[in-house]
């Protein structure tokens, strides 16, 4: 939602409720990280699931209010949108470094680059991804229940995309987020007040704590262990 990491050009939505919970508020900036003496920062990319957009009226309104965000975040595949988010983070860091701060930020892809970054007294940035749905490409673009016939092809695409994230330097991937995906069925992520204050129709309809990992999810976990 067009937050600026240098803290100089924040949009209206990011300034709301700075002292209370608001998922779009700006909580951190690169200057704050530098001032706080951080050595390593996890840069987590999260793309909202389509079911969440359908369930939450506020998000539907924001899609209409910010068409550029809709085009960038919700229209592409989860995989493409996640890569675009990481591209943008890297561009923001590069732009900030050009302003000649006292400490440079650098995205690192492996242990060797991390160690070099620390020796050089730079702040290491490491990519991470929240939600296994970010592995979904064109074949997996449809909702989980609609793509059963494509399962072998979807599984191959997911494993290929996982390897891409690894090569890009993603340090970890959470399997689940709010909704079931091709890897796993999650537990409900919110306390009771969250159920009352929001419409979780699609989540509650498909919520089953006994399902756990799918066969594809087990292969993804094994692949991550091997990596």
Predicted regions and their residues:
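N-terminal hydrophobic targeting/anchoring segments and the immediately downstream early-domain regions
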Residues: 1-215, 219-222
């Amino acid at each position: 939602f067009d937050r600026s990491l240098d803290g100089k050009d924040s949009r209206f939505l990011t300034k709301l409720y700075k002292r209370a919970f608001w998922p779009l508020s700006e909580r951190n900036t690169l200057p704050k990280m530098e001032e706080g003496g951080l050595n390593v920062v996890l840069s987590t990319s999260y793309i909202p699931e389509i079911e969440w957009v359908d369930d939450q009226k506020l998000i539907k309104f924001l899609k209409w209010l910010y068409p550029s965000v809709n085009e960038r975040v919700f229209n592409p595949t989860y995989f493409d949108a996640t890569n675009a988010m990481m591209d943008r983070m890297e561009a923001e860091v590069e732009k900030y470094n050009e302003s000649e701060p006292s400490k440079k930020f650098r995205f690192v892809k492996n242990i060797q680059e991390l160690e070099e970054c620390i020796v050089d007294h730079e702040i290491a940035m490491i990519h991470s991804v929240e939600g296994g749905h970010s592995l979904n490409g064109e074949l997996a673009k449809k909702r989980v229940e609609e793509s059963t016939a494509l399962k072998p092809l979807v599984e191959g695409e997911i494993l290929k995309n996982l390897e891409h994230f690894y090569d890009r330097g993603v340090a970890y991937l959470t399997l689940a987020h709010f909704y079931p995906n091709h890897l796993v069925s999650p537990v409900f992520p919110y306390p009771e007040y969250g159920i009352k204050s929001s419409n979780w129709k699609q989540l509650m309809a498909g919520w089953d704590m006994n399902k756990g990992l799918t066969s594809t999810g087990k292969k993804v976990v094994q692949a991550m262990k091997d990596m």
